[in-house]
Amino acid sequence: MQGNAIIEYPVDQTTLTQRYTEKSIELIKQNKEQPFFLMISHHLPHIPIYVSKPFQNKYEDPYANAICEIDDSVGQIINALKSLELDENTIVVFTSDNGPNQTFEPTGGTAYPLKGSKFFASEGGQKVPAIFWCPNKIKKGSISGLGSTLDFFNTFISLTGSKDINITAQDSHDLSPVLYHGSNSPRSDFFYFSSFIPPRGEIYAVRKGDWKAHFFTSHEPHFSSPDSIEKHPSPLLYNLKEDPGETYNLAEKYPNILQSLIEYSENFSTKLEIAPDRYSKKILSQERPEWAQ
């Protein structure tokens, strides 16, 4: 689709990545004389995995082929910025929305040595790469501080110098000092929720600094059913600095730390405003465009 127009049906998924890339470069060229914002949400490596012919036999693993084509796409876009002399005045961010999907092993990828995958509150489902690139403005290096895609909102407002925008998100932190000066991350905590499996609005896990407590876990990939969810009367406690794979439950050894995380979460819960269930009959019955019927 392009806007509300169906441009191809059924779609040839083997050409999607290259077409997204070509369209992105076209938009960059059209807006090279003015500030622009371009968000590219590639389908790959989400299932089903289809790659274009040049990448179909790069590796034995289809997932690896998909990643290889994504890498090529990023390279084409970076080269376009360089050829247009926009690279030193453009901020490029590369990241992902979640960890691999282990329901579809082996084509879903792996988060090893982290535990879990997509839809899990464990690190394998949540920890993803985040690369910021802008020559002469962002210095080369790596940072291990805590950050979230939630922080992109306030960070982008700061990076673009948009002083006329007086809107900020309460759950977003400005990471620009981290990027420009190597400062410590202003984010020290993160709360984990499930968007569609009950209990909605409950905190599934919380991280504060190096410590993380799990109030709910699932013994099945995808939190596939309410029956797969286990509520822990005594939450699980992990030190992510020493144990990033969340293997050793330290709840009995550090009861005071666990209690502080419980109280921290309870206090946060009192400030929550739960949004309507996006799958409720009320939401689904709202008028939608013809193509979405």
Give the predicted meaning of each segment.
Residues 100-112, 116-121, 138, 142-145, ...:
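C-terminal cap/loop subdomain of S1 sulfatases and analogous C-terminal strand-loop tails that border
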Residues 4-6, 22-66, 101, 108, ...:
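Active-site His/acidic residue clusters
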Residues 31-38, 86-92, 127, 185-188, ...:
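Loop/turn elements at helix/coil->beta-strand transitions in domains of secreted/extracellular proteins
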Residues 39-48, 94-100, 171-172, 194-197, ...:
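Short, solvent-exposed turn/loop segments enriched in Gly/Ser/Thr/Pro and often Arg
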Residues 48-50, 60, 66, 79-137, ...:
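Histidine-centered active-site microenvironments of extracellular/periplasmic hydrolases
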Residues 25-29, 78, 82, 153-157, ...:
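Non-transmembrane alpha-helical segments in soluble domains
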Residues 35-41, 67, 74, 81, ...:
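Beta-strand elements within well-structured catalytic alpha/beta cores of enzymes
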Residues 1-11:
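Short glycine/proline- and acidic residue-enriched helix-loop micro-motifs
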